[in-house]
């Protein structure tokens, strides 16, 4: 009897095992026939919150002050929109956050109606970290609201000038795309306040306009500098046969090239290697222009040549002929990143050349000295003067805004303008609140908590610098939360111990 029961149970068990695969197959068939309901979740469900830091500022592209109230400033930021202050930097408001681009290259106010603000989006420098823009923007209510006025394919806009007495006439210098040919390049003009645009200079696929200026005596006289520019991942082609200086005497309807005394650009009907007289072609790079407010027949040009060489040139006859004054040229990462030239409104032949450190000349460009910059960040891009104060200078740098009231002897730093451009971020596994780390453009690397248990939340005091120079990518140790890795430019790699503050270079070295 026991054996019968045993064999019966054993047989039932084998049947059960035999049926299991078929049950699985049947279950799979049923699952295939079931329609799974899916829901689309909008990204609007995820709300961003500001975690800082606010103790670092960032790269300034352009600054303009209100002509009737010099406490009102508008600031175009390379990677942070447009900001406005009405109390000389005590407090700030971001006024461009709802627009289609965060990169801005230039800003100007209508001289006839300063409530009208024009912004050119897309910063006009040649670095790999530069974002492209979305054309021209216009505000008629002091920056409260904006309207896109076209030129969306320009990507990088270098200058906007509004006619001094006719608000409908505006000129826009568009450098054009950095990484590709074509787009909207050259000098564009509108006669109807930006409703329509006409290209009046430049028609080459690589040639844009990098600087323009008007004769203060006659707005029909316009000077423009064109620039051949193209970047790849590996290299920057920062010059070419299309680079030149032009003048128009009829508001941009026709142009004359101004080349007498300048480096020898190609003339017509040549083979691209030598000119017709067998002299070698010397291609020019980025050009910065300035006009003397005291004697507007005097024009200055800072010209980049091949292999980061160059010079400053001066004309006393509206550009008909030029004299080389010196070999001075912007340095650092190259003139493509600087090269803006300014003439002082207070002193004839006083020039300021934007550079790693500002270079200034009091003799029309013959000699240059470094502007005193004690306790001030380097890498300068924009300058502002006051008509009624010869000792006042405001500078826009890679680390924000500085102003001097004593002709650069001392500097006031505008600390409360949070504009830092982060390349990449990383997080550690710290508890109860993980920390965030990132490398920034020219403001080192930094870290800070994702939250705190303090009533005030995250404040500047909770953030800290981890490394110096140009940061890029940070990384964290998955086990030891106080170990962080950070980078500097040109391949520098460091290990940082947050407990001791020790920084050790661990950049791999070549073996010989």
Language-model features, listed with the residues they occupy:
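Bacterial N-terminal signal peptides that target proteins for export
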Residues: 1-12
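Boundary at the C-terminal end of the N-terminal hydrophobic targeting segment
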Residues: 21, 26-27
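Bacterial N-terminal signal peptides
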Residues: 10-21
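Beta-propeller blade termini and top-face loops
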Residues: 27-512
